[in-house]
Design a protein with these regions (language model features):
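Interfacial/gating helices of multi-pass transporter permease domains
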Residues: 60-80, 146-151, 211-212, 253-260, ...
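Hydrophobic transmembrane alpha-helices of multi-pass small-molecule transporters
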Residues: 81-84, 196-201, 226-230, 302-305, ...
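Helix-terminus/linker motif at the lipid-water interface of multi-pass membrane proteins
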Residues: 47, 51-69, 139-146, 202-209, ...
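Small-residue-rich hydrophobic transmembrane alpha-helices
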Residues: 69-129, 166-185, 279, 292-350, ...
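Residue-level signal for short hydrophobic patches within transmembrane helices
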Residues: 28, 32-51, 55, 78-85, ...
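Short alpha-helical transmembrane segments in multi-pass integral membrane proteins
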Residues: 1-39, 97-164, 206-262, 318-383, ...
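Short runs within selected transmembrane alpha-helices of multi-pass transporters and secretion channels
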Residues: 159-177, 185-193, 214-229, 308-311, ...
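Transmembrane helical elements of multi-pass membrane transporters/channels
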Residues: 37-56, 158, 192, 221-225, ...
Length: 467
């Protein structure tokens, strides 16, 4: 057998073996073993994201200047919006390219790949221009108080300069998966995150650069991710190309690609607007309130992020058994994932509440600000155990292929419900109401999501029994 043919045969046999092994895991292994096998890698990936999101604020907090902590919190939402656009483009590009390859439409795949590359760079350049030319206007909209303007402007301008790198790395880490190249996207983002975490203490503490150092570390992390993805595209990809001629062949595909990725980014867009509105309300009470709320949020985010990671990991398990109409196993999966996520939520929430002063102290050094953060933290964790049901319901709807209800659920908690809750609760209860709005929004989102989940499950039972 020729060597090339032998390699192809071996690769096919390996893929077939992996597929059979995965099917056995989905179908035959104990539910607990299947859940943990699938959830652990997902949770580890989520934890890296949590550490990445905490790093800047943690090391800035070590300076003992809570104003700089608040500055980071104020600027965050506008870059979340930019990331949401990148997520839409990346997820849409991955789906459209993969579908085109499956249909043997390689020219379409190349056009979409080139559009994703150049659109991410172009969007990043436009974002950079807007952020640099309208810094004060944007910061005013974001809720920056007078004492935050200097730090926030510096932080935003440095990050803005690296926006093309950020958007490119987010978009292409998703798009390369369309060719089956899972590792390059994951490893590039991981390398960028590790670079950021290593450089943060060097620039922030060692060189005493504060928020400027934090921003530079972030940009350099994105640069590392971009370089690794660029090397892969140029050396290993058979479809993706930096040649603009492919993008110019069918530019109309860009709108279709963005539309396909809309469900993946819309929740992040709404979350960014909700965070901006929250900071606008918090600014009424000064930068100390913004810093306190940011510290409370960072201290508790690990709870919901791990719950989300568990449910994301279990999603293919639910999808396989939903497709097989294995109702007893579906029921067992739902029950055990609920037990795991809610049980973890209860334990972690209790731990966070008992250790709230120490957690807040990681980010805030001023005693008065830390006390505000501890008080606000209660409202952010009180409903967190229930969010296990929320993420389980959302992932079950996705696994069932109900894109509409899955999208509705994804925009509820941090967007469609939270924004009106912030307005109403602040009107009645002031600063405390801003934090309590998250509790009300979470509970309402859980009730709606679980209702949709039960409806979908009963539909499966009903349609299966009639066959």
């Amino acid at each position: 057998m020729p060597r090339a043919a032998f390699r192809l045969y071996a690769q096919q046999e390996e893929e077939r073996s992996d597929s059979v092994g995965n099917e056995a895991l989905f179908r035959d292994k104990s539910v607990w073993k299947a859940i943990f096998t699938l959830a652990i890698p997902s949770v580890l990936t989520i934890l890296i994201m949590v550490i990445y999101n905490m790093a800047d604020m943690f090391f800035i907090g070590m300076l003992g200047d809570d104003t700089q902590v608040a500055a980071i919190a104020v600027v965050g939402p506008v870059f979340s919006l930019a990331t949401a656009v990148a997520t839409m483009l990346g997820a849409g590009g991955c789906a459209v390219i993969a579908k085109s390859l499956g249909a043997q439409e390689h020219d379409t795949a190349r056009s979409v790949g080139s559009l994703c590359i150049w659109s991410s760079i172009l969007f990043g350049a436009v974002f950079t221009t807007v952020m640099l030319t309208a810094t004060d206007i944007v910061l005013g909209f974001l809720g920056a108080t007078e004492d935050l303007m200097g730090y926030a402007a510096t932080y935003m301008r440095v990050l803005a300069l690296g926006s093309p790198l950020m958007l490119f790395s987010v978009v292409m880490a998703s798009v390369v998966r369309a060719e089956g190249a899972i590792l390059p996207g994951m490893l590039s983002n991981m390398a960028g995150t590790v670079t950021n975490i290593i450089l943060d203490p060097v620039f922030i503490l060692g060189l005493n650069m504060g928020v400027t150092g934090a921003a530079i570390a972030t940009v350099l992390g994105n640069l590392v991710a971009t370089l690794l993805l660029t090397i892969f595209i140029r050396k290993r990809s058979g479809i993706l190309s930096f040649s603009p001629q492919y993008a110019l062949q069918r530019p109309g595909l860009l709108l279709h690609t963005m539309a396909v990725g809309l469900p993946n980014g819309i929740s992040s867009v709404l979350s960014g607007f909700a965070s901006t509105f929250s900071n606008q309300l918090l600014s009424i009470y000064g930068s100390s309130a913004i810093a306190a709320m940011a510290a409370a949020g960072r201290s508790t985010m690990v709870i919901t992020m791990i719950q989300m990671g568990i449910c994301m990991g279990a999603s293919p398990l639910m999808a396989y058994n939903y497709g097989a109409r294995n109702i007893p196993r579906i029921r067992e999966i739902l029950q055990k994932v609920a037990i795991l996520t809610v049980g973890f939520g209860l334990t972690a929430a209790a731990g966070c509440y008992l250790g709230r002063d120490a957690l807040i102290g990681l980010f805030l050094k001023d005693a008065a600000n830390a006390e505000i953060g501890s008080n606000l933290m209660f409202f952010l964790i009180i409903a967190s155990p229930l969010l296990g049901f929320y993420y389980l319901s959302s992932n079950f709807l996705q696994a069932a292929g109900n894109a509409f209800l899955a999208t509705v659920v994804s925009i509820l908690r941090q967007g469609a419900l939270l924004i009106p809750c912030l307005y109403l609760m602040h009107s009645f209860f002031g600063l405390t109401g801003i934090a309590a709005a998250h509790t009300v929004s979470d509970v309402c989102a859980v009730i709606i999501a679980v209702s949709f989940c039960l409806w979908q499950y009963r539909k499966l039972v009903r349609t299966t029994s009639t066959q």
